[in-house]
Amino acid sequence: MANIPLILASSSRYRRELLDRLGLAYTCVSPEVDETPLAGESPVQLCARLARLKAEAVAKTNPHAVVIGSDQVCDLDGQALGKPHTFEKAVAQLMSMQGKRVVFHTAVCVLSPVLPPQETISDTVITMRALTEETVRDYVEREKPFDCAGSAKIER
């Protein structure tokens, strides 16, 4: 399998950083996937579906490559919290998590031309302590988590 190209089906700088740590040669292709949750879909189902869709979207045009698709969904009381994209939405998401159990589902799907698909989901569970709004705003200003599920940078 040494001659099979490896493609990360993502535009996420965080996923690139994780793959860089392994020292593997790979390329990135940003998949075009509709990330809208389906009716009745749980956060963990959404996460698994998106990881697979991302891998499949890239594998269609790269059938001879190993393709890694991944997604992360923040699950607060059974509701998926997406990327906030704005300062105020990030503050609101983080304020809503205080004192609650929050699950970050991370799904990975690996598609290969020579092996069956491999899929897994890993959960990171946190309980957000009580924070002042000023502290939350300072965090959002400093970290700018606008592209992170649930406004939390938990990769570090």
Residue ranges and their predicted role:
Residues 2-7, 20, 43-156:
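Anionic-ligand binding patches
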Residues 5-29:
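N-terminal G-site helix/loop of the GST-like fold
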Residues 23-40, 117-123:
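Short glycine-rich, Thr/Ser-proximal phosphate-binding strand/loop in the N-terminal lobe
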